[in-house]
Amino acid sequence: MSVKFLLGRAGSGKTSYIIDSITEQLKAAPDGDPIIFLVPEQATFQMEQAILRRSDISGFSRLHILSFQRLSQKVLEEQGGIAKADLSDTGKEMIIKNILLQRKDDLEILEKVAVKSGFSEKLSRLISEARMYEITPEMLEQISQELDLIHLKQKLQEISQVFTDYETFLQHQGYHHQEDRLSKAGQKMEGNNISFLAGSTCYIDGFSGFTPQELKLLEGLLTKCSNIELALTLPPQFTGKIDDELHLFHPTLKTYNQVWELAVNNDIEIKKSKHFPNENEEHRSASSLPRFKDNPALAHLEKEWGKNKINPYDSEPTGLSIVEGTNLRNEIDKIAREIKLLVRDHGMRYKDIAVIVRELESYEPVIKAVFNDYKIPHFLDRKEPVHHHPLVEFLRSSVETVISNWDYEPLFRMLKTGLLPISSEEIFQVENYVLAHGISGKDWKKQGKWNFIANFDLERENIAPSNRNKQYLSEINSIKGKVRDTLLEFDSKLRGINKSESLSAQFKNQEAEEDNLLSVREISTYLWELIEQLQIEYQLEEWSLEAEERKDFVEMQLHNQLWDTVIDLLDQMVTFLGEQKVTLSEYLQIIESGLANIKLGLLPATLDQVLVGTADRSRYHEIKVLFMAGVSDGLYPAKIDDDGIIDDRERITLRQHDVEFAPTTEQKLYQEQYLIYNVLTQPSQKLYLSYPAADSEGRTMSPSTIISDIQEMFPELFQEYQNDGPENDEDFRQYIIDGKKAVSNLIKLINKVGHPEKLAEDKQQLLAYLINEHPDLFYSTPEIKALDYKKSLSPLTQEVIDKLYPNKIATSVSGLESFCQCPFRHFAEQNLRLKEREYFRLEPASLGLFYHAGLKLFWDKLQENNLTWHKLKTEEREALVSEIVEVLSERLKNRILLASERYKYFKKKLHELLSRAVEVLSWYSDDKGFYPVGSEIGFGKDEPLSTLELELPSFPNKKVQLKGRIDRIDTGKKDGDLYLRVIDYKGKSKNLELRDLYYGLDLQLAAYMTVAMRNSDKLTGDQMFPGGMLYFGVENPVVPTDKPVSPAQARDKLKSTLKMRGYLIDDEEVLDLMTREDENSQDLLPYKLRTSSPGFYKNSKVLSEQEFLAVLNYTESKLVELAERVLSGEIAPYPYKDGGYSACTYCPYLAVCQFDLNYKEHKFWNVPAKGDYLSLILEEMEEVKE
């Protein structure tokens, strides 16, 4: 028995020596004594390939390439000890989660975090760590008795309790830890003959250190193998040096001493170490290491790295680059271009190239996107997490759906997995319905059909749904039936509900979930039955085949492996916890802890691909080119968080009591230097270091000290800066990856310099060459197509216009106002009929429906009971309002006002609002003055009043027909003449500005007055004259005062606040008829009489009869103008802007039209701030007459 150390720095030839030795032995004696090649788990495949690549080795039987786990497996297979399977990490975490749930009332220090997501994983890691370092629960308990630190003392006791429960559980089940396999294999090797090790030669490579369990197994190898040769990255002259944690080679020096001590303790012969290279370390030449024989610069880097005093390289280095990217994507784009050039121009294979990052989380999506864009085959060397996979989400959300009683969020998470027999279109359709109508779990479970529809006519009861709504409800209920039929039995089983129970009894039992305990076996069985019912296995197979057809081998392997993994997970739950009685919430926590721990190891799809890995995991052999990306501060060296259950100070305390866990963060930081050295020295020909100046969110990032250290070592090294695309004075050849990339980068450069003529001469020549010699390629690239893209919409074709409006435009005044605000908004609203998703909540539109319907019903009640508005007593008015509010609460949005305490509060506020509105409107109603003749009077087809139909001179064969509803029409008599007042309700106080009317932004009141005057015969039978058109703000304001006021003063202030706004006839007698107040009506209306002389103040909103009629005629002409613009097909975004407000401010279609002032096609039309618009209207109407 002997051991020999193979010592040398990185790249000195240790691994090549081992492979050469093995291949020579295999050639000399293919059936000779066993050869063991022990390497880290992730390096076994590479070592197999390295040996098989030798031209004269096509296979072997005597060679065993093993990791410690595989070695222990072989030992236990031969000697016994694996009758039961090892406990997997997933099983371990579920067991620990269950123990924490059972012990949650016994824990104090760990109580707050015991049920939190992720804590069971941390505790699982700690227990694994304890097992690897041969720490038992009893040791933790004993040390806790010796400590004076109360917090640590109690923490150790609680950890010991959980640890003991875990150990006891496994003993009863007959399982053992994965971590124990190494220790058990080491014990089996003591005193037993291991046949496959008899007479064997063992080579060990790729390790910088060993855990106590690995050392135990290594000790067994020392006593069983004939010869062991252990390779360590350690300069021979350091083997006798003082143990200094700060030294670069401290990790391997510590390992050397540990193995030496094992050999001495077991009387193993320690042969003279073999040094690499075979000359004195201090006198070797810069390029004497085999790996760097062709690159003196990389040899110099290896030699000088880690020294306190660096010897600068005296010339410009080759094969070494530093690049700063403006951002992470530009950094990876530069790497991708370099890889393509290396393969295309320098004869590299993709497998000769590796990309190393410190952590994959931020880089993975960018690397995938950019490498796929450049068509670079690559393999991510990591365990693939599966928490976003549809099957994993299905397992979580199916149980959560039952727990939450079919709550929206988990239910639709489950539906959107694609594993239920419901199409995506059906899911989106029913989701919109559920969100709009506030569908709850009990609504899903009831057998009856859903019949909620959007009711925009709250005044009438039991309105029959239209044919369109009937079809819609039929589709919705069909989808509801599919969901219900699929899940109801599963739900009943988990709740322990008998199918023969009445529906009311079932609902009564649904609230008893916490008391309804089922065994883990029962719940898992029901879950499995649902999986089988849905034929999920076949769906995964179908997805796998589809992925294979797309050549997405990563997704293909995910689907294939995950099915078996999930089956194994459920098996373990039943095996370990089968008879354990749990609530559904506890079961969910247990299965979630298991699912969170699933990570799948995927195989490379091909051998010739770029390996993308992390510095601490990935192992490389014979890599020629290495791209070290993300060399930023905080990543190299890594920030090692002290976030474990036992922190660094506590670990140091435990070490003082002879209990040593894994290294502290400080020790890991020391080891980080060795890790960096190991990465930097991997490539034999080229090393690229890069870092981004900003992260993905634009935050500034600083380069790592590695960059400054290398710049100090290589003062002649030129640092590159990678911007977003090429520069005009830059060598463009590196951007000519292929034709499309050449065009793409040329376009970027043209955009940057402003014009093709400003390109440098070589770029102009390339541009001309591509256009003349490869026009198809040039003009087919997306960037060139984008140059022709105009961010404007062409007018609709006449064919489309005729289909939309065959004979007429049937619309509303507000529809044409919408067109005036922005033609695209009108197109999206009226033609495309785009709508925002509706939610079950109170919105301005719903509130508008409420108070319009409330005021209409109040008027109807007055009519039914032969009451007059102004003669109602307060208590009578309040009784009517209360009755109306109760009626509307039942009708508004599926009884939303009764849905919760919050909405019941809104109901109260709406009651106050309606009550105030009715009170204020009574001030304007007097049967001796102006009094309503109708409320919410419709005009249009099948309405009391005729359609407002206007001729369109530019389109003789078409007309515009306007429909709508007038909130209130009042009339009053003066000297036998009937005057008309039109009132429109708004959610808040609003002015009518002639400027807005002139430009077509506010035509509603004037159009309504025109409709009323044209329909005078139907309203009163008499001719009517204009009296006023007013907006009434339905609001209940709080009026501020600077001192206490009397009720009369408060009433006066309220009048001023709630006055109607608009335009009135300039007749004082008519205006006095407008209110029933004893005092002058000007407190309630928008006018003010002069006191010193007859007439109105300048700011009074009054018009003469001639002016009134001119305004109404102008309104008609404006409506015609807008209708003709609609018929011309105008749909391009052209929003109005008024000061700081524009049509885009609250527009829901902004994301659709993509209005952007950076494009010349896009601009606002501005509404002038001031002007005498009455004069303009009068002038234009005078011109029309002429």
UniProtKB/Swiss-Prot annotation:
GO terms for biological process: double-strand break repair via homologous recombination. Its cofactor is Mg(2+); [4Fe-4S] cluster. It comes from the Bacteria. [4Fe-4S] cluster binds at C822, C1144, C1147, C1153. Disulfide bonds: none annotated. GO terms for molecular function: 4 iron, 4 sulfur cluster binding; 5'-3' exonuclease activity; ATP binding; double-stranded DNA binding; helicase activity; metal ion binding. InterPro entries: ADDB_N, DNA_helicase_suAddB, DNA_helicase_UvrD-like_C, P-loop_NTPase, PDDEXK-like_dom_sf, PDDEXK_AddAB-type. Binds 1 [4Fe-4S] cluster. ATP binds at G8, R9, A10, G11, S12, G13, K14, T15. Despite having conserved helicase domains, this subunit does not have helicase activity. The heterodimer acts as both an ATP-dependent DNA helicase and an ATP-dependent, dual-direction single-stranded exonuclease. Recognizes the chi site generating a DNA molecule suitable for the initiation of homologous recombination. The AddB subunit has 5' -> 3' nuclease activity but not helicase activity. Heterodimer of AddA and AddB. Belongs to the helicase family. AddB/RexB type 1 subfamily. This is ATP-dependent helicase/deoxyribonuclease subunit B. It comes from Natranaerobius thermophilus (strain ATCC BAA-1301 / DSM 18059 / JW/NM-WN-LF).
